[in-house]
Every structure is written in C-alpha cells, then in structure tokens.
Amino acid sequence: MKALRLPGQPLCEVFGFPINNFDTEAVHYRTEKLCPFNNRVPQCTKDKAKDPLGVCSIKEGDSAIVICPVRFRQSWKIMADVQSFLLPNATKSDFVTEVKLKDADGQAIGIIDVVLVETDQREVINFGALEIQAVYISGNVRNPFRSYIVTFSY
C-alpha cells in the first residue's frame, strides 16, 4: 500500500480513508467515528469505545503500515487467502468471528478472532483458527491523531 500523506503527518488512514481524502463519505466516516472494514459494530472500537483511535495505518518511508487488526478485514479478502492456505480443497466453507474459547470447566479463557469451517451436508469436517495481529502503538499516534481531527474538523 502506498502511503498517502499530508506534509509532516505520520498517519496514512483515519477511520478507513486516506488522510488527504475529504469527500463526503470520508468526512461522514470521520465525523461518526465509523469503521468500513467489517468491525463487529459500525463504530471504530480501537483503544477506547467512546474516544476511538481511528488510525488504520501509519507511514513508514513510502509505505503504509497497518496498525489496526480490523483493517485486514477489508472485503474479507483475508478469509479467501486463509481458506486457500488452510482448506485448499474445501468446496463448502464459512467462517465465524470472535469465537469464545472456554476451558474444560466452561470458564472463558479468550476469544479467537476467526474460525474457518469446511462443511459437508451440515457437518463440520475441518476447521482452522485465525488470530489477526497488527502493530499496536496507540500511545505513539494519539497526539498526531487528535491534531489531525482538530485541524480537519467538519
């Protein structure tokens, strides 16, 4: 991904759009603090639900580096890639997100981001789990993010 930027600004995407995109849709997403990348809810939830850090990617040289794991859900392409790797011969498959994992006593021990399942006549015959990770640097971009939002408030 090529980094689109404003001079001196380390951010590449805010609330799903390049920082130099000010069309109606981009402004709407920023104003409403929305996430266009298949988040579990329409709003961005990165860092804090009421004051989300809507930074999807930052610049590194001439490239953009994804810092939000939800960003990888764009058009669910990641699922097609994972299926071709984990279940290359599957003819019927589906996936579920945010699957709660419990221990032998039924106690919650975590959440799996995505479980891909291969089915045959309504039975699961194979599956694979996917944990999506991205660089997490909320403290390093909170100030540039706030500055951007204040400077380009609508």
Question: What spans do the regions from the language model cover?
Answer:
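Short, low-complexity, polar/charged sequence segments that are solvent-exposed and flexible
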Residues: L86-N89, Q133-A134, Y148-F152
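Residue-level marker of positions within ordered structural domains that often coincide
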Residues: R73, T119, V135
